[in-house]
Amino acid sequence: MAENQYYGTGRRKSSAARVFIKPGNGKIVINQRSLEQYFGRETARMVVRQPMELVDMVEKLDLYITVKGGGISGQAGAIRHGITRALMEYDESLRSELRKAGFVTRDARQVERKKVGLRKARRRPQFSKR
């Protein structure tokens, strides 16, 4: 496919992102759509751009991303994790900077399951004294 392409897998909640990085001019393509088309919310776009802005490579690399599962926030987090891993494969010296910002660690928080006899994961049914 490409001569010098770097890959990273990112996960968050129930989303999984595959990120390919190539030298270029800062184009970000997510599921064959631009970043602006894919994410309507500015916060999600900001989360995706964070690792690139941290290491000053916004205009130096092109990103090709496929993401599946979850919602907007989970997908944005998965993409950020994938970009971080791909950047570390591209240049290992960026690891400490990315680690300090907290992008390397996989956010392990998952939705807690609903339990039998409860209304939600922890919410109990209303108690009636009489």
UniProtKB/Swiss-Prot annotation:
Signal peptide start-end: none
PANTHER family cross-referenced by the UniProt entry: RIBOSOMAL PROTEIN S9 (PTHR21569), SMALL RIBOSOMAL SUBUNIT PROTEIN US9M (PTHR21569:SF1)
Annotated keywords: Ribonucleoprotein, Ribosomal protein
Xref: Pfam families: Ribosomal_S9
GO cellular component, one term: cytosolic small ribosomal subunit
Protein's name according to its UniProt entry: Small ribosomal subunit protein uS9
Family of the protein in this entry: Belongs to the universal ribosomal protein uS9 family.
SUPFAM superfamilies: Ribosomal protein S5 domain 2-like (SSF54211)
NCBIfam families on file: PRK00132.1
GO biological process: translation
GO MF term list: RNA binding; structural constituent of ribosome
